[in-house]
Swiss-Prot record:
NCBIfam families xref list: gatB, PRK05477.1-1, PRK05477.1-2, PRK05477.1-4
Phylogenetic classification of the source organism: Bacteria, Bacillati, Bacillota, Bacilli, Lactobacillales
Gene (name only): gatB
Keywords: ATP-binding, Ligase, Nucleotide-binding, Protein biosynthesis
PANTHER family, A to Z: GLUTAMYL-TRNA GLN AMIDOTRANSFERASE SUBUNIT B MITOCHONDRIAL AND PROKARYOTIC PET112-RELATED, GLUTAMYL-TRNA(GLN) AMIDOTRANSFERASE SUBUNIT B, MITOCHONDRIAL
Reaction equations catalysed: L-glutamyl-tRNA(Gln) + L-glutamine + ATP + H2O = L-glutaminyl-tRNA(Gln) + L-glutamate + ADP + phosphate + H(+); L-aspartyl-tRNA(Asn) + L-glutamine + ATP + H2O = L-asparaginyl-tRNA(Asn) + L-glutamate + ADP + phosphate + 2 H(+)
The protein's name: Aspartyl/glutamyl-tRNA(Asn/Gln) amidotransferase subunit B
Organism from which the protein derives: Streptococcus pneumoniae (strain ATCC 700669 / Spain 23F-1)
């Protein structure tokens, strides 16, 4: 029997506000344990939450970017549960009326087709703290993350393969990043994914029993975990067994999912309206103000790169996959850089350098200005493409102007025949055996002089000019 895969994803995204959702403490990642806390985060008696307007701004932008309807009458709810990293014993979230609902996003699949994935809801909530279990037998609680604003984006169960889930996450990350509401860095926990997966016989409308997958710390692991679950569940069903409703985690080392706990039934969080936060209304004017702050999104930008700048679909997709890279490209082209040349450098030498150094584009000294200047002095013959690679490394590490560095470092390409011809004659004088081979008609003897000349000029001879002059002088040599 063949089965249809049914997948839905729950994605938690940390919003990049300066302060937390209900307290004025910093929401910055990476500070010392419990440095970003105050009496609200510790839930001292009598303290009251105050909603951060920037969080609602970000929620509206997310809803608009994901084609969602917006609940204009806003309220929050208490989700009650006890855990050491949750000192209030409840989480302030949104239950029955999330800020956004009934949305969708279009994703591009590997075969070039597109598919629209529904988004059930997006709700605002506060993050919990973090427990660390020490080797000394103690558990430690860090509340820096407590109260950091989150938006949880819940998809419809519209994905029918791990590939589609991967494509959905890729598209969602792009949209959130371009909207400017999160840096969506999974390695820092600012984007976290839980997956629900079930199988059902083809043609059956009723969903099968679902399994929830956790510990998915990369898009690649989401895909691998789902692929494993498809195989595991299919084998159980084909052997006549039944799928249990359970939570499993993906074990990267064993490339398998491992049971965490069996779910007996739905958890009862005893939601009720948050009494310490008043109801308020999101006006049409507020929504339109947020709409005007949204940028051009990746899909539209890719289309423009192809139609207006003449880039290939592949180049356009690579450039727009990251907002920082795309914005860098935009500025470089606006400064007069050739779109194809800028694209080639960003996808080639720049990408290789970043991978080797373990850095991002923002962490190096290369700017759109000095990249365009470097491309310009390649095109006008000041430096060769080979020398340009050395110039780029200097710019990436030290910044500054490309032309100024080239002139100070003595890297200017030699194109003047009055300089090159005497060097060619000296090459002939220094390599009498090669000259004899050439005059005797030895096959490919002329090619040795190209290497001699480039070594004599330390690679600074303009290849086109140098080869033309070399051929000219070799012809004279043969005549004599």
């Amino acid at each position: 029997m063949n089965f249809e895969t049914v997948i839905g994803l729950e994605v938690h995204v940390e919003l990049n506000t300066n302060s937390k959702i209900f307290s004025p403490t910093s929401a910055h990642f990476g500070n010392d344990q419990n440095a970003n806390t105050n009496v609200i985060d510790w839930s001292f008696p009598g303290v009251l939450p105050v909603l951060n307007k920037g969080v609602v701004d970000a929620g509206i932008k997310a809803a608009l970017a994901l084609n969602m309807d917006i609940h204009k009458k806003m309220h929050f709810d208490r989700k009650n549960y006890f855990y050491p990293d949750n000192p209030k014993a409840y989480q302030i979230s949104q239950f029955d009326e999330p800020i956004g609902y009934n949305g969708w996003i279009e994703v591009e699949l590997e075969d070039g087709t597109t598919k629209k994935i529904g988004i059930e809801r997006a709700h605002l909530e506060e993050d919990a703290g973090k427990n660390t279990h020490g080797t000394d037998g103690y558990s430690y609680v860090d509340l820096n993350r407590q109260g950091v604003p989150l938006i949880e984006i819940v998809s419809e169960a519209d994905m029918r393969s791990p590939e589609e889930a991967y494509a959905y996450l890729t598209a969602l990350k792009e949209v959130i990043q371009y909207a400017g509401i999160s840096d969506v860095k999974m390695e820092e926990g600012s984007m976290r994914v839980d997956a629900n997966i079930s199988l059902r016989p083809y043609g059956q409308e009723k969903f099968g029993t679902k399994t929830e997958l956790k510990n998915l710390n990369s898009f690649s692991n989401v895909r691998k975990g789902l692929e494993y679950e498809v195989q595991r569940q299919a084998e159980i069903l084909r052997s006549g067994g039944q799928i249990r409703q359970e939570t499993r985690r993906y074990d990267e080392a064993n490339k398998a999912t491992i049971l965490m706990r069996v779910k007996e039934g739905a958890a009862d969080y005893r939601y009720f309206p948050e009494p310490d936060l008043p109801l308020f209304e999101i006006s049409d004017e507020w929504i339109e103000e947020m709409r005007t702050e949204l940028p051009e999104f990746p899909k539209e930008r890719r289309a423009r790169y192809v139609s207006d700048l003449g880039l290939s679909d592949y180049d356009a997709s690579q450039l727009t996959a990251n907002k920082v890279t795309s914005n860098f490209f935009e500025k470089a082209v606006a400064l007069g850089g050739d779109a194809k040349q800028v694209s080639n450098w960003l996808q080639g030498e720049v990408a290789q350098f970043l991978n080797a150094e373990g850095k991002t584009l923002e962490q190096i000294e290369l700017t759109p200005e000095n990249l365009v200047e470097m491309i310009t002095i390649i095109e006008d013959g000041t430096i060769s493409s080979k020398i340009a690679k050395k110039v780029f490394v200097h710019l990436a590490k030290n910044g500054g102007g490309a032309r100024e560095y080239v002139e100070k470092a003595g890297m200017v390409q030699i194109s003047d025949p009055a300089i090159l011809i005497p060097i060619i004659h000296q090459v002939f004088a220094d390599n009498e055996a090669a000259v004899a081979d050439f005059k005797s008609g030895k096959r490919n003897a002329d090619k040795a002089f190209t290497g001699f000349l480039m070594r004599a000029t330390k690679g600074q001879a303009n290849p086109q000019v140098a080869l033309k002059l070399l051929a000219q002088e070799l012809a004279k040599l043969k005549e004599n």
